[in-house]
């Protein structure tokens, strides 16, 4: 007989019915000759009972059952007695008395029990077992629901799902490409796509108006908890749109996914702040809006300070983020922190380049010598008054200061703000705090390379009010350097993590060539790498823009997990290896010869 029910679907309404169940032995217990088995499939558990008095043959077979054996059990649904009801199981009010048992497969003894706390490496080595865990099955089923919600919503909004090539040409997008050698074209290589960026733009030029794809992308970069060498994007592009159109559409997709998968209502419209505001108030371009603390800028008032550290930072000149900055972060109630705790936070900001962490404990008004700190004696009344007005500090508060290059101050105090907010439990009640960050700079100055780089990618459109600065012969006026040119780019941030990013694209050939020129990509290189795009732009390209949502990150945050590896079926380690399949691996010399390749790698010999 074929399966009639999933394990977790059997309920009191089926009492008296005969059902056929299939699944794995989760647990087996022998109580006075009666054998109880928790049978598991992807939906959950149900208790099946083998009674020697009622059905001797299946009971005899049940003596051979062990963990993870695969069985088919046919039996009658019966109500459990009052004393045996299990309120912790969905099926805890019933059990199935087995009349017929088929053992479909046996199992070797497990290297670990599925409910054991084990190392991640062991989990990844035996991923096929780890995926049987209820929490992993929940995670992947949840991911499935998100994907189906997105597809349904975008299809209903007039989007066309189009697949783009996995084998394409190498183009610079900020990270290293994964390269694939061509056997048919010796010496040439494909690249696995870092994103479908150029193809989706070409689809807009081809007139498809609204495109989407749930797509695999590849980046050969150093990994951390929220990154993988291959990852999944919810990718979309729209024609004849402005930033607001893309952001509103994206909000509707995300809001629907939260509602369907979590039953959570996300307030709309999502708050919007500019990049400049994010950096000024929070120090990071992906601020965690659950934390109400803000940074305050003291640079101007500290330019004449007697405190050398503040004065030097306030008067430091430099291009881009190399100019000086002095900021303060008020920690409400932080005056209770011990010196040891403050030293720990000082070490923490050192990770981000800060040379120290000045502080003031507010024990009373500054006019009454109520501020406790080694730096107070260097501060004049005007500076103290400015600090008080900026922070509105109260008795019991703690003030942390950053003084250095803007890049160091923003990063260190921005990260400290998040750390303090979480460790001191200063998060607001909003569990999912979304924010749009808009008007990113178009370009960033690389001080080491002495050249401009694209903040997002070379195809991002500049803000229409700032295009004039790109068109100047020298690239920009003295009063308005290129780093101040804004872009029509926008990021969606959730709880301090970027979950999506996009922009309006350049649809004018001359402007696109100018952008490449500013990035020091010459005509020959531009033609070689982007010639197909530049040609397409000349044949009636519409205004267009889009966005990509990181599916792995989004699901991780929705489930409150720490690592995206827990929402991916077969992830890689932080060394980009698969412990289960042992990929990457050596290949046969004949395969390399076919590809006209040979390895020059020489392993280190033991000394």
From Swiss-Prot:
Gene Ontology BP terms: aspartyl-tRNA aminoacylation
Protein family (similarity comment): Belongs to the class-II aminoacyl-tRNA synthetase family. Type 1 subfamily.
Keywords noted in UniProt: Aminoacyl-tRNA synthetase, ATP-binding, Cytoplasm, Ligase, Nucleotide-binding, Protein biosynthesis
Catalytic activity: tRNA(Asx) + L-aspartate + ATP = L-aspartyl-tRNA(Asx) + AMP + diphosphate
Gene: aspS
Gene3D superfamilies associated with the record: Bira Bifunctional Protein, Domain 2, GAD-like domain, Nucleic acid-binding proteins
Protein name: Aspartate--tRNA(Asp/Asn) ligase
Chain's role: Aspartyl-tRNA synthetase with relaxed tRNA specificity since it is able to aspartylate not only its cognate tRNA(Asp) but also tRNA(Asn). Reaction proceeds in two steps: L-aspartate is first activated by ATP to form Asp-AMP and then transferred to the acceptor end of tRNA(Asp/Asn).
Localization (cell): Cytoplasm
Annotated ATP binding sites: 219-221, 228, 498, 550-553
GO CC list: cytoplasm
Superkingdom per UniProt: Bacteria
Molecular-function GO terms, alphabetical: aspartate-tRNA ligase activity; aspartate-tRNA(Asn) ligase activity; ATP binding; nucleic acid binding
NCBIfam families in the record: aspS_bact, PRK00476.1
Subunit record text: Homodimer.
Primary enzyme class: ligase
Organism the protein comes from: Magnetococcus marinus (strain ATCC BAA-1437 / JCM 17883 / MC-1)
EC number of the protein: 6.1.1.23
Binding site for L-aspartate: 173, 219, 456, 505
Region (Aspartate): 197-200
Main location group: cytoplasm
Chain positions of site Important for tRNA non-discrimination: 31, 83
């Amino acid at each position: 007989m074929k399966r009639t029910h999933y394990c977790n679907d059997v309920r009191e309404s089926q009492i008296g019915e005969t059902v056929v169940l299939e699944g794995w032995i989760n647990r087996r217990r022998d109580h006075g000759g009666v054998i109880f088995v928790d049978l598991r499939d992807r939906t959950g558990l149900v208790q099946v009972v083998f009674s020697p008095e009622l059905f001797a043959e299946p009971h005899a077979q049940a003596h051979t059952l062990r963990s993870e054996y695969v069985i088919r059990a046919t039996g009658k649904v019966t109500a459990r007695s009052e004393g045996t009801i299990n309120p912790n199981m969905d099926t805890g009010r019933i059990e199935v008395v087995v009349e017929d048992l088929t053992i479909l497969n046996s199992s070797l003894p497990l290297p670990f029990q599925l409910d054991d706390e084990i190392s991640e490496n062991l989990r990844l080595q035996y991923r096929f077992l780890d995926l049987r865990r209820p929490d992993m099955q929940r995670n992947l089923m949840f991911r499935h629901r998100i994907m189906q919600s997105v597809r349904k919503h975008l299809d209903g909004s007039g989007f066309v799902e189009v697949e783009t090539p996995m084998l394409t040409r190498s183009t610079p997008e900020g990270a290293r490409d994964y390269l694939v050698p061509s056997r048919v074209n010796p010496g040439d290589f494909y690249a696995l796509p870092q994103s479908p960026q150029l193809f989706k733009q070409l689809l807009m030029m081809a007139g498809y108006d609204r495109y989407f794809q749930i797509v695999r992308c590849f980046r050969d970069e150093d990994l951390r908890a929220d990154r993988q060498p291959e990852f999944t994007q919810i990718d979309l592009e729209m024609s004849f749109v402005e930033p607001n159109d893309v952001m509103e559409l994206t909000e509707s997709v995300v809001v629907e996914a939260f509602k369907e998968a979590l039953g959570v209502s996300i307030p709309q419209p999502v708050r919007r702040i500019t990049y400049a505001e994010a950096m000024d108030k929070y120090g990071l371009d992906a601020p965690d809006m659950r934390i109400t603390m803000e940074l305050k800028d003291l640079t101007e008032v500290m330019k004449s300070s007697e405190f050398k550290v503040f004065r030097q930072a306030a008067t430091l000149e430099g291009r881009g983020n190399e100019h000086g900055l002095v900021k303060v972060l008020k920690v409400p109630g932080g005056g209770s922190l011990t010196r040891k705790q403050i030293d720990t936070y000082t070490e923490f900001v050192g990770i981000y380049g800060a040379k120290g962490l000045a502080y003031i404990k507010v024990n009373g008004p500054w006019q009454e010598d109520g501020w406790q700190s080694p730096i107070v004696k260097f501060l004049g009344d005007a500076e103290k008054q400015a600090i008080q007005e900026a922070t509105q500090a109260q008795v019991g508060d703690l003030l942390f200061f950053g003084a250095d290059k803007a890049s160091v101050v923003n990063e260190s105090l921005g990260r400290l703000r998040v750390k303090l907010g979480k460790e001191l439990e200063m998060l607001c009640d909003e569990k999912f705090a979304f924010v749009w960050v808009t008007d990113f700079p178009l370009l960033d100055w690389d001080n080491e390379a002495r050249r401009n780089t694209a903040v997002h990618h070379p195809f991002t459109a500049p803000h229409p009010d700032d295009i004039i600065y790109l068109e100047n012969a020298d690239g920009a006026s003295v009063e308005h350097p290129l780093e101040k040119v804004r872009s029509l780019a926008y990021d969606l941030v959730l709880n301090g993590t970027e979950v999506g990013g996009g922009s309006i694209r350049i649809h004018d050939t001359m402007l696109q060539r100018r952008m490449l020129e500013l990035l020091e990509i010459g005509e020959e290189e531009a033609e070689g790498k982007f010639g197909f795009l530049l040609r397409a732009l000349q044949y009636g390209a519409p205004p267009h823009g889009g966005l990509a949502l990181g599916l792995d990150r989004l699901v991780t945050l929705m489930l409150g997990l720490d690592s995206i590896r827990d929402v991916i079926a077969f992830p890689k380690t932080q060394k980009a290896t698969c412990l289960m399949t042992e990929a990457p691996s050596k290949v046969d010399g004949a395969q390399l010869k076919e590809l006209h390749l040979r390895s020059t790698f020489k392993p280190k010999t033991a000394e």
